[in-house]
UniProtKB/Swiss-Prot annotation:
Assigned protein family: Belongs to the PAPS reductase family. CysH subfamily.
Name listed for the protein in its UniProt record: Phosphoadenosine 5'-phosphosulfate reductase
Lineage of origin: Bacteria, Pseudomonadati, Pseudomonadota, Gammaproteobacteria, Vibrionales
Active-site annotation: 244
E.C. number(s) listed in UniProt: 1.8.4.8
Protein's gene: cysH
Length: 258
C-alpha cells in the first residue's frame, strides 16, 4: 500500500479534475484501503495525505471511538467542535470528560451570531420546516466548520461517519474530496458491534444519554429519544433529514463530494 499510486497523489492535481475523474482516480486506492484495519488506514493517511490533518467531532453517542483511534496515531491532532450553543448539558460534560481523558487538542468554533441574536432575527429556525433547518445548520454548523478548516489550513479531514448509520452514508468511500480537502473515513465499514467492542476493549464510554434511550445526539431541539418503530434517522431533525450539512459538498467550487 505504501508503494501504490496513492502516495503520489497531490491534492492540487485532484482538484483540477472533474468529480467523476476524482472518483475514478481514488477508486484503486479505496479498494486497497478497504483491506486495512482502521488504525492502519489512519496511519496511512497521516503519511500520505498532505496538509494539516484535523478530526471533527460532535461528541455524540460513539464519539470516543474516533477520538481515541486518531489520537493514538497523532496525539496533538486538532479536534474541531462546532458548538451551536444548544447542545445538551450532558454533551458539554462529555466534552470535558473526553478532553481530559484523551488530552485532546480541542478547537471550538461557533456561529458569527450568538444563538439569542439568531432567534431575534430569524425566530426558531428549527421549527420552520426543512428550509429553516437547513438555514440553521448552515449558520451554526457548516459555516463554522468551513472557517475551522480554513483557519487551521486543513488538507485532510478525518471523520467518524459509518455506512450503517443511514442510507445517505451507505455508499461512502474511505477517501474522497469534499470542498477542497481530503475527507477520510477510517471506520466507515464498522458496525455498532465493532464500535461496542472497541469502546469496551479500551475502557471508553458512550455518551451518557445513550442510557436514556438516545441513539444519536445533536442539539436539544432537533434530537428525539428512540421509540419502538423509529429508525435512527428519525430521531434527528424531526425525521426531515439525516445530514446537518457538514458532510455534504457545496457543489460550487470543488468537484467530488461524499
Amino acid at each position: 500500500m505504501h508503494n501504490s499510486v496513492a502516495s503520489k497523489l497531490k491534492l492540487a492535481e485532484l482538484l483540477a479534475l472533474t468529480k467523476t475523474e476524482q472518483i475514478l482516480r481514488l477508486g484503486q486506492i479505496n479498494a486497497e484501503l478497504e483491506q486495512l484495519t482502521a488504525l492502519e488506514r489512519v496511519k496511512w493517511a497521516l503519511e500520505n495525505l498532505e496538509g494539516t490533518h484535523v478530526v471533527s467531532s460532535s461528541f455524540g453517542i460513539q464519539a470516543a471511538l474516533m477520538l481515541h483511534l486518531v489520537t493514538q496515531a497523532k496525539s496533538d491532532i486538532p479536534v474541531i467542535l462546532t458548538d451551536t450553543g444548544y447542545l445538551f448539558p450532558e454533551t458539554y460534560r462529555f466534552i470535558d470528560e473526553l478532553s481530559q481523558k484523551l488530552t485532546l487538542n480541542l478547537q471550538v468554533f461557533r456561529a458569527q451570531q450568538s444563538s439569542n441574536w439568531q432567534e431575534a432575527q430569524y425566530g426558531k429556525l428549527w421549527d420552520q420546516g426543512i428550509e429553516g433547518i437547513e438555514k440553521y445548520n448552515k449558520l451554526n454548523k457548516v459555516e463554522p466548520m468551513r472557517r475551522a478548516l480554513d483557519e487551521l489550513e486543513a488538507g485532510t479531514w478525518f471523520s467518524g461517519l459509518r455506512r450503517e448509520q443511514s442510507q445517505s452514508r451507505a455508499n461512502l468511500p474511505i477517501l474522497s474530496i469534499q470542498n477542497g480537502v481530503f475527507k477520510f473515513l477510517p471506520v466507515i465499514d464498522w458496525t455498532n458491534k465493532d464500535v461496542h467492542y472497541y469502546l469496551e476493549e479500551h475502557g471508553l464510554s458512550y455518551h451518557p444519554l445513550r442510557e436514556q434511550g438516545y441513539l444519536s445526539v445533536g442539539d436539544t431541539h432537533t434530537t428525539k429519544k428512540w421509540e419502538p418503530g423509529m429508525t435512527e434517522e428519525e430521531t434527528r431533525f424531526n425525521g426531515l433529514k439525516r445530514e446537518c450539512g457538514l458532510h455534504e459538498d457545496d457543489g460550487e467550487q470543488y468537484g467530488s463530494g461524499i
